[in-house]
């Protein structure tokens, strides 16, 4: 299960709509969890990481683990696979996620998030907090090469997203797109003030009408 900004959604084992699958019957059969990075987006994933009834191995330290770490949580610098796992187990997760993904693509405004992801293609995609990043978490495709994704941590903070996108675009070699909600855009609109001697980025900003966030 990989968040949009993790850089791992293109992995061959990535699960679409993983947060939905992790809240279903397959989750009851989990025997061990391995996590890396700092998961923050989906409550079902956070609930899995807060479990005390299965061993959890986190690649990293406590600063990147999003739950209270009980005695079942082990922090390690790296892991090595002991061998190939049960391919039927992986297939059941992938097929379940793909079914959810197909159903969700017909829903607005999720189609907007998917269209922006596709438009970014091999470029840079900067994503604002609240609904946009969560929409992408549902509909951004997996097991396919996608854009480089940047998203500010915290997800409750929206100030400075426009400036973040401009700064990132200025350092990127290709086209850049930013997707953000209406309130996020308003809170960062002063970042659009670019002086006459300052460089201008190749940046498209897409503002999602999400009624001030969700």
Language model features by range: what are they?
Residues 2-3, 36, 59, 126-130, ...:
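Generic beta-strand/beta-sheet core signal
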Residues 1, 38-41, 129-134, 156-157, ...:
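Gly/Ser/Thr-rich loops at beta-strand to alpha-helix junctions
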Residues 32, 124, 175-177:
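Structural motif
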Residues 44-49, 115-116, 138-139, 191-195:
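A short acidic, amphipathic alpha-helical/loop segment
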Residues 1-11, 123, 133-140, 202, ...:
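Redox- and metal-dependent alpha/beta enzyme cores, enriched for Fe-S-associated oxidoreductases
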């Amino acid at each position: 299960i990989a968040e949009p900004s993790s850089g791992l959604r293109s992995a061959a084992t990535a699960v679409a709509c993983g947060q939905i699958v992790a809240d279903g019957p397959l989750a009851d059969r989990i025997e061990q969890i391995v996590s890396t990075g700092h998961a923050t987006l989906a409550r079902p994933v956070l609930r899995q990481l807060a479990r005390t009834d299965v061993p959890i191995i986190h690649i990293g330290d406590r600063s990147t683990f999003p739950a209270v770490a009980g005695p079942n949580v082990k922090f390690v610098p790296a892991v090595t696979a002991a061998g190939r796992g049960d391919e039927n187990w992986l297939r059941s997760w992938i097929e379940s996620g793909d079914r959810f993904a197909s159903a969700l693509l017909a829903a607005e405004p999720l189609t907007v998030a998917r269209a922006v992801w596709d438009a970014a293609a091999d470029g840079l995609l900067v994503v604002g907090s609240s609904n946009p990043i969560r929409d992408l978490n549902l509909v951004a495709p997996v097991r396919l090469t996608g854009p480089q994704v940047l998203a500010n941590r915290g997800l409750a903070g929206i100030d400075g997203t426009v400036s973040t996108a401009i700064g990132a675009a200025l350092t990127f070699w290709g086209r850049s797109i930013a997707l953000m909600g209406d309130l996020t855009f308003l809170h960062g609109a002063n970042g659009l003030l670019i002086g006459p001697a300052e460089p201008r980025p190749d940046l498209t900003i897409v503002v999602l009408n999400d009624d001030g966030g969700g």
